[in-house]
Swiss-Prot record:
Pfam families: Pox_A22. This is Resolvase OPG149. InterPro entries: HJ-resolvase_A22 (IPR006932), RNaseH-like_sf (IPR012337). The lineage of its organism: Viruses, Varidnaviria, Bamfordvirae, Nucleocytoviricota, Pokkesviricetes. It comes from Vaccinia virus (strain Copenhagen) (VACV). Keywords: DNA damage, DNA recombination, DNA repair, Hydrolase, Lipoprotein, Magnesium, Nuclease, Palmitate, Phosphoprotein. The keyword Metal-binding does not apply. Its EC number is 3.1.-.-.
């Protein structure tokens, strides 16, 4: 006999988005169910040492249906994280792993990061979670992971969100 909690709810989708990096990787986990979005987790991670074990632990915390990874330049030292995640989930999960371009585009790195944090804080107001956002100067990594996940959800719903408009929608997904 199984309990209702042990049965997988197939009407919901668990979306995980990673902003890749060794020092400041970040993860956002959203549950999309019946046209609503619930924030399950927004975390700064640390993959600076023993990264294989730490990534495996971070990947094993939820049953994802979709994992979004921020695309990295071909010669980036962080490409190893993408291949490790794809390999780890290949036989152990039904999750779809997708490499996507960053949400924000623009002339300067600083401008992109500023707009990403502003959009993130606006979403935190919308979800009623602004008070739980720590007062930190380094929010751009969690903001980037959150914006990756929200752009994916909004694109699935064919919903336009002005801060994400500078990205050519639907062209951001690329097989790696």
């Amino acid at each position: 006999m199984s309990s209702p909690m042990s049965k997988k709810d197939y009407s919901s989708e668990i979306i995980c988005a990673f902003d890749i990096g060794a020092k400041n990787p970040a993860r956002t986990v959203l549950e999309v169910k019946d046209n609503s979005v619930r924030v399950l987790d927004i975390s700064k991670l640390d993959w600076s040492s023993d990264w294989e074990r730490r990534i495996a632990k971070d990947l094993s915390q939820y049953e994802y249906t979709t994992v979004l990874l921020e695309r990295q330049p071909r010669r980036s030292p962080y490409v190893k994280f993408i291949y490790f995640i794809k390999g780890f989930l290949y036989h152990t999960s039904a999750a779809k792993v997708i490499c996507v371009s960053p949400v924000m585009s623009g002339n300067s790195y600083r401008d992109r990061k500023k707009r990403s944090v502003e959009a993130f804080l606006d979403w935190m107001d919308t979800f009623g979670l602004r008070d739980s956002v720590p007062d930190r100067r380094k929010l751009d990594d969690v903001a980037d992971s959150f914006n990756l996940a929200m752009r994916y959800v909004l694109d699935k719903w064919n919903t336009n969100y002005t801060p994400y408009n500078r990205c050519k929608s639907r062209n951001y997904i690329k097989k790696m």
